[in-house]
A protein has these predicted regions:
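N-terminal cap/lid segment of alpha/beta-hydrolase-fold proteins
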Residues: 33-91
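Short beta-strand element of the alpha/beta-hydrolase
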Residues: 92-101
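Conserved alpha/beta-hydrolase
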Residues: 116-141
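Conserved acidic catalytic loop of the alpha/beta-hydrolase fold
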Residues: 215-233
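Conserved alpha/beta-hydrolase fold motif
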Residues: 234-235, 258
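Gly/Ala-rich beta-loop-alpha elbow adjacent to hydrolase catalytic centers
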Residues: 235-244
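The feature captures the conserved acid-bearing segment of alpha/beta-hydrolase catalytic domains
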Residues: 260-329
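Catalytic active-site module of serine/aspartate enzymes centered on a nucleophile-bearing elbow/loop
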Residues: 340-369
Length: 369
């Protein structure tokens, strides 16, 4: 067991949930309406907000690759869209970059499926500028359509097409650990399963496997973004959980802290030299509850196995003199958190634990230097 290096007193939260859900049927979904979105009592005061792109390259494509919408010519590909909010009075606080997981977009960090405040706004209210990218090939970052149009034109074999990934509602329940099977929530489950249809609406086609170059351009874009911000805390989730590590290896000076939320992997392949580089940056790994739930995806390791792989990585980094911690809410009596921990009913309680870690292990360390 990896010992904790920081302590926060938090009361246990045990929430019983009874769910009557019909999963896997076609037809209209339960619609969220504007009145379901909760408005905080205090205003959100911003110094700035906006959006921009990081990276990208200009390529020339044929008329057919462009879908026959006018002549061939040049377009931009592999750019990363970023939306940001900067709080009034937050000067000097470290920016936080939040990266979404597979088949999702930056929406993961915004208003929760049941209409509560998301981590993007909450971190801003706590004084941190927040930057929310859409991974290259996803959402407003777009994808390179030429690989599909070439197949349609017969110039590329169909087998060369990227795989389009999506999670079904049925698959999300065990893999995201809302319950052991669709419609059967754990008694202490923290995810708002009554709004699970709203989570389904957040899903988008994902061409990460074969639809983006190798290495994934998002990795360098994150490193470049952190550099443009003169240093930032990088936070990844699920598929992107290891992205902050990879960005830190590109430019450790720009990554002031790394937060890995339920990472899909904590790679064991890192060399001693890479571990020494990662040991220069404070790292926090965050996992939820019920990790022994069968994911329903035999080709992937269980969440408990991933948890143990992250413990092993933490051990290697500490042995190299680094600061690395595991935030495991069940150790603190906080039960029932899901894979979508940033959307759980106690999401702000978990956010406070992360914010305290950033303050103690990143901001104060930066100030001391």
């Amino acid at each position: 067991m990896i010992r904790q290096r920081f302590s926060i007193a938090c009361p246990a939260i045990l929430v019983g949930v009874t769910v009557a859900a019909v999963i896997g049927t076609t037809g209209d979904m339960m619609a969220q309406v504007l009145k379901d979105v909760q408005t905080p009592d205090t205003p959100l005061v911003l110094k700035a907000q906006g959006s921009f792109f990081v990276g990208g390259e200009k390529v020339e494509q044929t008329q057919g690759e462009l879908g026959n919408l006018g002549p061939g010519g040049h377009i931009a590909v592999n750019q990363m869209y970023v939306r940001y909010m900067v709080p009034q009075g937050g000067d000097g606080n470290l920016p936080v970059v939040m990266v979404h997981g597979a088949t999702l977009t930056g929406k993961s960090w915004e208003t929760t499926p049941d209409g509560r405040m998301g981590w993007d706004e909450y971190f801003v209210r706590k004084g941190h500028p927040v930057y929310i990218p859409d991974q290259v090939g996803r959402g407003r970052s777009g994808f390179n359509q030429a690989v599909f149009n070439n197949v349609r034109a017969g110039s590329t074999p169909p087998a060369n097409q990227p795989v389009w990934l999506r999670f079904s509602d049925e698959g999300a329940w065990p893999n995201f650990r809302f319950g052991p099977q669709a419609g059967a929530a754990y008694p202490d489950n923290q995810f708002p399963v009554s709004a699970v249809d709203e989570l389904a609406k957040q899903g988008v086609p994902d061409v990460s496997f074969g639809g983006v170059p190798t290495p994934n351009p998002t990795l360098k874009a994150l490193s470049d973004l952190a550099s443009q911000l003169n240093g930032a805390v990088l936070m990844g989730h699920s598929q992107s959980g290891s992205f902050p590590l990879e960005a830190a290896l590109i430019n450790p000076a720009a990554t002031k802290g790394l937060v890995l939320v339920e990472p899909g992997s904590c790679p064991a392949r890192y060399t001693p030299e890479q571990i020494a580089t990662l040991a220069k940056v404070p790292i926090l790994v965050v996992f939820g509850d019920h990790r022994d739930t069968a994911t329903g995806i035999p080709t992937l390791p269980s969440w408990q196995n991933r948890f143990e792989a992250c413990q092993a990585l933490i051990g290697r980094i500490r042995s190299a003199g680094g600061q690395a911690d595991m935030l495991n809410p069940p150790d603190r009596g906080i039960r029932g958190n899901s894979h979508m921990i940033m959307q759980d009913k106690n999401n702000l309680q978990i956010a406070d634990l992360i914010l305290q870690w950033i303050d103690e292990q990143v901001s104060k360390r930066k100030a001391a230097k």
